[in-house]
């Protein structure tokens, strides 16, 4: 019964094995089908991509052709125009025309780009897809062959396993059979042994012999079966071992195929497919991205051109395009009739009165017209600003129209929301047209009025020159007078700064706001010092100075002092330059903000230097005003310094290397090495094109760097530091007023509107009531308005209660001038005034050498905060060479005569010991000018004229009068010096006011040089400024100090007029100029 079940079991085993092998065989076939299907799908996908790009290339080609047609259509119209010829020549076009050409160029550029894109699709991308398809098919075939080989090997392994398994079954069955036979033999042996245990005596001999032989047979059979069993058992063990080994090998082969070989087969099919497809699609992306880059570059060019839509430059280009039409014609010359040789307006006695009357009428008429025209101008400018606000409304953002979302509701027409469809457009257009009509009406009115003013002003100026008036009285006008110069501070002992902001390692904007210094003193002073002594210094800013000296200068500035104020200071130029660099390098926020670094560096990509400068200007205009003013001042100085590169070896590039890391440090996140070259290029561009980049004084009110500086010029700016009067008030503990009555507040009424130029000056409206404390100078009061203390300009107010003689109206001075004969001669042009700080001209030094006499010593002027004492006329009597044209002699005759006749022992002198400047002049200084009495310089016309006899004065008489006047003044100076016992530190305000009252008058009496002098009912003394040249051969003159005007850049001091050619002089040697006088110690430090 056991055998059939055993065979059945063997069959089940074989059937199960065969079933498993069959499943593997079917799986191998399915794998091959899947690989084949995958390859077909790839080929189909690649075919679709080819068709897609082929169609897209056709579309791009068609689009390119249409764009080319569009551009050609409009380019054909412009090729024959003058604009196109100008564009081809130098590309200097009007900005709108430039935008138009750039639009057409952009269309042509896009046309070329799309044609290039189509070519890339056809000849590059599609070819790549075709190659990928061929490669995929070939790889599948190769992989299929390898797969068949692997399948055969796998089936051989399975067949071998089947054979080994059957062998194992067979030997195992034989072993079992032999074992059962052996067991049966053992049982028979046991039975036989059991029988042999019976008593032998009962068994017959024959039976006993028969049993013995049967036992032997059983033993032999057992031995035989034992041997058979052992043999079969060994075979079975060997067969089983072989089967197990083969089974393990088969399982390993199957596992390897499914885990490794199959993956390798798939990799063979995919070999290069994804990489090739990646390259093909990246070719497409590169083409599209480069198309967009090219488009963006073109749009950036157009955007830059749109940003440069500027009417001023277009106006200039337009006028340059038609020079013949817009060039001013030649002036009309005087055409003499029948030999008439007179070509000037005659002011002789018969017509003098008529010309005087006409001059007065023109003066009055001009004043009225200017006020009216100024109001019309303000209205015009306000209307223009309104129109500009209307036309510059930012309504061009259409980003909402391009917002994408999954919802189709957002993809709707936005035409209803555009600017042109808004309901308010009609009303806006109507308002704009109405405003434009009003603007043109006011503009026509303003132009007509300004034309009339121009004609009347020309006549007025000609009459003024003819009649010989140097300074007309301002009482004739009804418009606000020029703003007087600010009272400047004392430089003798600069007190410690009152601001709390750090100078070094601080914030520039905060420091300017806190200190009131528009240009920090350290910047202004260092630049001035280098301007005077270091422009030709080789290697300036590149060669390091003494660290000890740099620290000393730095500490002095931090204490609020100015160590460079003394012109005789022998600081090393390199140390001063090092302090300037140290200041900018230590700023908490660099001069160029870090947030603007990337924007500025991006300007390097602009090759055109002018366009680059304009782009930099656009970026810098976003900076704070205070920083921009300092930046403008610094780069104007660096540009000036680079003009001496032949001597100092510092061209703009070298200066940029020195100042680049200081002014524009590279952020830490940037590459320091690569960015530094770009930074230097930016700084170099700003140095070279600083006039283009920075707004001028008209656009940005503030100090402007002057190339020609003198020892005291750098404080001439009306933007000097505030709080100077407080420093004067604190100096020596003196009171800045001239009488005890001024201690009581005085009420005043504003005649005109005034807007303060700084926080120190008060702003007020016409008719406002002001409270005046005391007189700070001839031009300024210390007062209060609306609870705020500050400076009040004298010429803008009417004083209700004034007992002080200095504070009285200047009409008293005019009366005294009209009644004083000895001083009327001195009303000459202010251009002839001699500066006490002038150096000796070459002519004078040459004459001294010819005489064999040493020239008078040249004294460097002391420091003041402004180059002249604003509280003291610049004709200080400490200069013993009295100039007949000095305003002091013409403007203050009463004070001069009173001073001359004043008893030195009078109560007035005792009450004011040492306050007059005369007591502060040393005898040695006073005696310096006795050697060479000078001849007074001529007026601007070149000769002395008297309107009484119309004859030129004798030069010898003039020299004799000058000598007598000089000797008299010197004698009085010596007497006053001997009698003066009190010495005190000079006070700017008090000394100035005392000198105005106590100035001596010359002894000579001559006729007035100007008939207009007797006409003026009120003469305001001209505000003058002193300019001291740093070179020995440069002469400076006094010139009227006018209020700073927007757009008017400060210029170097004008040279004196040439001296008149007087009789009895060598034609090769000019007349001796007045010798150098000692410094006016009432205004110097």
Swiss-Prot record:
The F-BAR domain mediates oligomerization, binds membranes, and constrains plasma membrane protrusions. Expressed in brain, lung, kidney, and testis. It comes from the Eukaryota. One of its GO terms (cellular component) is cytoplasm. Homodimer. Forms a heterooligomer with SRGAP2 and SRGAP3 through its F-BAR domain. Interacts with ROBO1, CDC42 and RHOA. Interacts with FASLG. The modification Phosphoserine is found at residues 416, 835, 917, 932, 999, 1032. The modification Phosphothreonine is found at residue 1001. Transmembrane segments: none annotated. It comes from Homo sapiens (Human). PROSITE patterns: F_BAR, RHOGAP, SH3. The record marks 542 as: Arginine finger. GO terms for biological process: cell migration; negative regulation of cell migration; Rho protein signal transduction. Residues 475-496, 808-954, 997-1038, 1051-1085 are annotated as: Disordered. It is linked to Thyroid cancer, non-medullary, 2: A form of non-medullary thyroid cancer (NMTC), a cancer characterized by tumors originating from the thyroid follicular cells. NMTCs represent approximately 95% of all cases of thyroid cancer and are classified into papillary, follicular, Hurthle cell, and anaplastic neoplasms. Residues 19-314 form the F-BAR domain. CDD domains: F-BAR_srGAP1, RhoGAP_srGAP, SH3_srGAP1-3. This is SLIT-ROBO Rho GTPase-activating protein 1. Residues 506-694 form the Rho-GAP domain.
